[in-house]
């Protein structure tokens, strides 16, 4: 996508290489992408995101004044429908964009996760000044790329749109927008006066960048990335421990015979019933003792480390009561307070993004004519 946007608009991704690698790593951790010497079946990143999202929206209610126009209320209802998805995308990638999509009355919203758009310019505070997106469209046997570049300016928002017919893995040639019926109403360049920023509501995680110190937002579990990989490696080692602990019977190598596939194995007729205890007739059975408790203790240490780094309540990931760990009432209260602060910060981030989205609906509704009403105050209860 970065190369296509660069070819179409002559702009590069301003994200540093270190941050781009970190974003890929966060999504790999969430989706359990396979890595050498790791067992990703545990998916602790998905557990963290899922539990926090349910806690944040447990008693959520957003409302507008009773006399608000129906179109604006419809927009808020559409925003609520993508709320949980958007927050989870933001927790995974650090940032999620909420794109208002004009409807006959009001707006629907699309949640754009961090790996689905390219920041083309940011200010010193990390706010987007230009952003690029791409949508792949398929018509019969042909594939098209709809590229969009949004740029914030003093005169308002400028949206540039290009449609390309893909040639294999290359961008191909630029074709008119009316080539596809779904793009027939689009124009190559559109200026929307009075629209703030890039015309997208931004949901950012309230964490300082711990990857490269840039203005980019980071994943909620970015500080614990190393521990999450250590957990996956430990799980793979534990699996190996159980595999190596299987009972085995030792036999002389000269008893092995090749089978039809060329693999050496014991013949079935070598195994006969024994009338006595195998230990009394000279057969050696290998059944080693497992060391799983050491691995499980280490696993709990890593999980508690994740909880401490991410401000989670003890027991969210690890076992709540662990033998050998004495905790005072002050420590327990401090952990609960950290978790409460974490949840409140996430609630505040969503409330700010929701308010920004409603403000955009007021501005865009006046321009498009599908919601020509002034902005109404949004109230969010938790």
For each feature predicted by the language model, list its residue ranges.
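Extended, helix-rich architectural segments
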Residues: 1-128
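Generic structural marker for isolated residues within well-ordered, non-membrane alpha-helices
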Residues: 70, 303, 358
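Short amphipathic alpha-helical segments
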Residues: 75-83, 223, 227, 294-298, ...
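Extended, regular secondary-structure scaffolds
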Residues: 97-213
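Extended, charged amphipathic alpha-helical segments
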Residues: 182-334, 378-380
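Residue-level preference for well-ordered alpha-helical positions
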Residues: 307, 362-365
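Glycine-rich and small/hydrophobic secondary-structure elements
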Residues: 333-349
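Extended amphipathic alpha-helical segments with heptad-repeat/coiled-coil character used for oligomerization
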Residues: 368-382
């Amino acid at each position: 996508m970065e190369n296509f946007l660069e070819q179409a608009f002559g702009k590069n991704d301003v994200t540093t290489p270190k941050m781009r690698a970190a974003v890929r790593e966060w999504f790999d951790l969430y989706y359990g992408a396979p890595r050498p010497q790791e067992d990703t079946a545990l998916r602790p990143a998905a557990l963290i995101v899922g539990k926090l999202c349910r806690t944040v929206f447990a008693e959520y209610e957003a409302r507008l004044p009773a006399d608000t126009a129906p179109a604006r209320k419809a927009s808020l209802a559409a925003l609520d429908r993508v709320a949980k998805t958007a927050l989870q995308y933001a927790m995974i990638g650090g940032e999620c964009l909420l794109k208002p999509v004009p409807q006959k009355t009001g707006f629907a919203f699309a949640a754009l996760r961090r790996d689905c758009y390219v920041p083309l310019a940011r200010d010193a505070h990390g706010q987007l000044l230009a952003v690029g997106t791409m949508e792949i469209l398929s018509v019969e046997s042909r594939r098209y790329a709809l590229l969009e570049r949004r740029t914030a300016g003093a005169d308002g928002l400028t949206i540039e749109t290009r449609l390309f017919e893909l040639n294999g893995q290359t961008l191909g040639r630029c074709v008119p927008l009316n080539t596809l019926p779904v793009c027939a109403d689009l124009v190559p360049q559109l200026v929307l006066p009075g629209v703030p920023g890039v015309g997208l509501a931004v949901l950012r995680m309230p964490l300082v960048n711990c990857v490269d110190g840039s203005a980019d937002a980071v994943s909620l579990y970015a500080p614990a990335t190393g521990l999450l990989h250590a957990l996956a490696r430990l799980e793979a080692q534990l699996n190996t421990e159980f595999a190596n602990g299987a009972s085995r019977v030792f036999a002389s190598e000269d008893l092995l015979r090749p089978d039809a596939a060329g693999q050496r194995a014991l013949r079935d007729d070598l195994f006969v019933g024994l009338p006595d205890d195998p230990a009394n007739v000279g057969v050696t059975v290998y059944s080693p003792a497992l060391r799983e408790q050491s691995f499980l203790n280490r696993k709990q240490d890593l999980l508690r480390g994740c909880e401490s780094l991410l401000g989670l309540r003890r027991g969210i990931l690890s076992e709540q009561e662990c033998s050998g760990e004495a905790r005072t009432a002050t420590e327990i209260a401090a952990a609960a307070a950290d978790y409460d602060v974490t949840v409140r910060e996430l609630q505040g981030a969503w409330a700010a993004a929701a308010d920004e989205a409603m403000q955009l609906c007021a501005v865009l509704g006046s321009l498009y004519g599908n919601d020509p009403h002034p902005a109404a105050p949004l109230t969010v209860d938790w």
